[in-house]
């Protein structure tokens, strides 16, 4: 990827794509922002609206609508296109429809001569990220999904409300599927550098008996709690995409829980799942392998097995 440019394309200008675009423009993450949608006029409208807010920011981002052909010079292509789950469905239930969309999208982007980084949010994001890797032929470090980045943020928010601590002082990750089977590596969750398991043990009088499984379930179901109230989620995932894109351009070696293709890490091969990874200008610099407990390894493996079973339904 060229290191003297900052150009991003967003494919899909629905609520997630437009929220991501808004975050990118407000933060001045890129110099050029290309919007692509099956409804071209929708993309044109979003580009116009975003351009009109430039005077109220400290940045100058060129925002315009275009087509796949324009992706040739992009550094990052963000894909948010895909169907939203209907009531009662899981993210995995949208796989068939999402997979068909990706075949068209990735084919169009790659035909342009694109040679940058794919950043995915389309659900089920772990499997779709794997599919895009296969379809694109790009190195695995340059195909990244949002994975459990948002889940990890939700986890920290839930813990911060429980412990009365700023969520930015809490460190830890949800791993595995961005969905119902995700797990938390509790042995690596810290608050101000102190293990949370130690804190909960020492302060039982203050916090009582905390059911960690309930916290995991609350984290995994957070999206559905939002869905029940407003129909879908977009601010959190939009900001997650912008955050990852910023980390790529800034080459800041930030550790983020993303969908990454494993090739021996955690003893897994030919699988895309949510794991912490070091993000740089080249994409994923390194996958961080946490030393999981036996119970955590088992939960992580179960989540990965679910992903593998669904991968088979689209030929992988």
Curated annotation (Swiss-Prot):
It holds the Pfam family Ldh_1_N. Its EC number is 1.1.1.27. One of its GO terms (biological process) is glycolytic process. PROSITE patterns: L_LDH. It catalyses: (S)-lactate + NAD(+) = pyruvate + NADH + H(+). Keywords: Allosteric enzyme, Cytoplasm, NAD, Oxidoreductase. Disulfide bonds: none annotated. It is found in: Cytoplasm. It is an enzyme of class 1 (oxidoreductase). One of its GO terms (molecular function) is L-lactate dehydrogenase activity. The active site is at residue 178. Allosterically activated by fructose 1,6-bisphosphate (FBP). Substrate binds at residues 91, 123-126, 151-154, 233. Beta-D-fructose 1,6-bisphosphate binds at residues 156, 171. The keyword Cytoplasm applies. GO terms for cellular component: cytoplasm. NAD(+) binds at residues 16, 37, 42, 68, 104, 121-123, 146. Coiled coil: none annotated. The keyword NAD applies. Pathway: Fermentation; pyruvate fermentation to lactate; (S)-lactate from pyruvate: step 1/1. Belongs to the LDH/MDH superfamily. LDH family. Catalyzes the conversion of lactate to pyruvate. Homotetramer. NCBIfam families: L-LDH-NAD, PRK00066.1, PRK06223.1. This is L-lactate dehydrogenase 3. It comes from Bacillus cereus (strain ATCC 10987 / NRS 248).
